[in-house]
Amino acid sequence: YLGAGTTLRLPPNTREALREWLRAPLQLQQIDPQGQVVRSTPLQVAGALDDLYASATMPPLGVQTGFMAAQRRSATRLSLWAPTAAQVQACLSPDEKAPASTVVLLQRNSQTGIWSWQGTAMPGSTYTYLVDVELPGVGLVRNRVTDPYSVSLTANSARSAVLNLDDPALQPIGWVGHRRPAGAEYAVDQRIYELHVRDFSANDPSVPAEHRGKYLAFTHADTYGMRHLRALAQAGMTDIHLLPVFDFATVPETGCTTPALTAGARADGPEIQASVMAQAATDCFNWGYDPLHYNAPEGSYATNAADPAVRVRELRQAIMALHGAGLRVGMDVVYNHTSASGQHAQSVLDRIVPGYYQRLS
């Protein structure tokens, strides 16, 4: 889309200086012989950041816990890629409810653009980041954000969780050593059934009420839904394709409701649509194509959205149950979607590295 434009290049010896220049708003200006600005435009920095920080794809990002060989002790490490940030801090809380008790300053690696901190935050603690970054047209702002690489969160994505996915407390009985069914020899022979977690069981009276619309609905082998899936597997179905089960924005993870539709209205009439839209902000249903955190399970499908460990454990239980029915499990990943951009409260990536992740008109 820029192919017809003029190409300008910086001298090779400016590469290191460019790392610092990109931490402030940059403009390209055309200046006439009298020193007057004729034209001015902000720069699109994504390509430059890719060129400068390609090595940032190698180190692990997010949270790592456990034995750290360099220090010969157990520790927690937080890592965030924010190459244009002026400062990054982490606000640590001992659990999902307590206010932040510690604020720590992350250190920047100028070659990778990764900010990191290592300390003694225990599994089960929670955190958010404070990212100080220049916003074009605004100036320096401080954004409180969750970790885009979170593996789990508290209710409504308020805080990221310090978890080790290898922790036995997150592993259902039988998880270690568990094997999924063998796949089809050729991909063309896969038979895939697309399924929405909530819709699978929300209205199934054979599922215990507290598990309807939840991950744990799959663990009840004698329900209408699971009997149906086993029958499909016996008939040749090979794979379940789950609509998004990563953390998404549009369903309140606590206190969501099922819309009360207008009595007597035509099913295909405008009254029904208006009734649903009027209650959309609290509706328990959404397809989930508005990701907040790609690597964390959605909390509205868990029996306790407030406890970050529960959603991880229960999603694993659901996967094991589907494998037990003879079905492999895949997940719809929509990396071309985000819930929001800019300074919106449900924008995560764009409030960490403004202008990098999304190309907007």
Q: What role is predicted for each listed range?
A:
Residues 2-73, 109-117, 121-217:
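The feature marks proteins involved in alpha-glucan
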Residues 81-88, 122:
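Short proline/glycine-enriched turn/loop motifs at strand-loop junctions of beta-rich domains
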Residues 198-361:
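Substrate-binding/active-site clefts of carbohydrate-active enzymes
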Residues 88-90, 127:
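Short beta-strand elements bearing conserved aromatic residues within extracellular beta-rich modules
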Residues 101-109:
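Ser/Thr-rich low-complexity repeats and stalk/linker segments
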Residues 74-78:
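Structural beta-strand segments of beta-rich domains
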